[in-house]
């Protein structure tokens, strides 16, 4: 009985310690991305742009045949969680997370926010995004 009580107490302490740690973490790894609409303060639009709208039904953020992914987000701070996995070869590679804008209906790569460490994949990375970032452009380094 004491063990059960102690385990319950430890679980509650763990929940309190970690509460709020990832309150605003956007995970594009294992979920469908809606074409529009709010999700924890984040708005998605044109997350994969490949010519005439190919690849728009992909799950998660995947780099298109042009080698990039783009989406819009609301002006709130948070974390972007990505899982890097190279499906074509075993070579390590990096990913650049940049500011992005739409100009003339096409995504444009802006200022570099972060470059991930070299990964062979699958490897999880988390990038902090501040409230001034309203468009994200992801590409291979």
What are these regions (language model features)?
Residues 94-98:
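Beta-strand signatures of extracellular beta-sandwich domains
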Residues 43-51, 58:
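A short aromatic-anchored loop/beta-hairpin motif
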Residues 21-40, 51, 89, 99-141:
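Terminal, low-complexity interaction segments
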Residues 15-20:
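Sec/Tat signal peptide C-region and signal peptidase I cleavage site
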Residues 4-13:
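Sec-dependent N-terminal signal peptides
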């Amino acid at each position: 009985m004491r063990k059960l009580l102690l385990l319950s107490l430890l679980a509650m302490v763990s929940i309190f310690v970690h509460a709020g740690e990832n309150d605003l973490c956007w995970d594009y790894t294992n979920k469908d991305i809606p074409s529009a609409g709010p999700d924890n303060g984040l708005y998605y639009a044109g997350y994969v742009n490949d010519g005439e709208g190919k690849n728009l039904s992909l799950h998660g953020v995947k780099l298109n045949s042009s080698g990039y992914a783009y989406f819009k987000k609301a002006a709130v701070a948070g974390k972007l969680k990505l899982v890097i996995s190279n499906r074509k070869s075993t070579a390590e590679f990096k990913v650049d997370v940049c500011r992005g804008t739409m100009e003339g209906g096409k995504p444009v790569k802006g200022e570099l926010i972060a470059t991930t460490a070299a990964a062979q994949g699958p490897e999880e990375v988390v990038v902090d995004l501040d409230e001034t970032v309203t468009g994200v452009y992801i590409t291979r380094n």
